């Protein structure tokens, strides 16, 4: 019985029991729990016509895989809770 109990405890500790990642999400830039299967946080930045005066556009969110982006769009992906804060303007 002790061996069986030990195996059950080890199994529970080794399994990811429904853990979901938390990421910052735009437009509110608040931390939210990602949907099941989306364990990647991303920060996507790009320039639009107002880039010179307003700075780069920023999109924050969750994804199942790191999004593929077009030329001129920067993407940073990470996989820990709230690892995608709104970038500081330089």
Swiss-Prot record:
SUPFAM superfamilies: Snake toxin-like
A single cellular component GO annotation: extracellular region
Disulfide feature: 23-41, 34-62, 47-51, 66-77, 78-83
Subcellular location: Secreted
Pfam family membership, one: Toxin_cobra-type
UniProt xrefs under CDD domains: TFP_snake_toxin
Segment forming the signal sequence: 1-20
Expressing tissues: Expressed by the venom gland.
Gene Ontology MF term list: acetylcholine receptor inhibitor activity; ion channel regulator activity; toxin activity
Keywords, alphabetical: Acetylcholine receptor inhibiting toxin, Disulfide bond, Ion channel impairing toxin, Neurotoxin, Postsynaptic neurotoxin, Secreted, Signal, Toxin
UniProt function note: Binds with high affinity to muscular (alpha-1/CHRNA1) and neuronal (alpha-7/CHRNA7) nicotinic acetylcholine receptor (nAChR) and inhibits acetylcholine from binding to the receptor, thereby impairing neuromuscular and neuronal transmission.
Protein family (similarity comment): Belongs to the three-finger toxin family. Long-chain subfamily. Type II alpha-neurotoxin sub-subfamily.
Name the record gives this protein: Long neurotoxin OH-34
């Amino acid at each position: 019985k002790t061996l069986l109990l030990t195996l059950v405890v080890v199994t529970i500790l080794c399994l990811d029991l429904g853990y979901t990642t938390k990421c910052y999400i735009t437009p509110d830039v608040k931390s939210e729990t990602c949907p099941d299967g989306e364990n990647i946080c991303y920060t996507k930045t790009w320039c639009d016509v107002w880039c010179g005066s307003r700075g780069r556009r920023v999109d924050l969110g969750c994804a199942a895989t790191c999004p593929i982006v077009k030329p001129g769009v920067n993407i940073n992906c990470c996989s820990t809770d709230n690892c995608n804060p709104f970038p500081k303007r330089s």
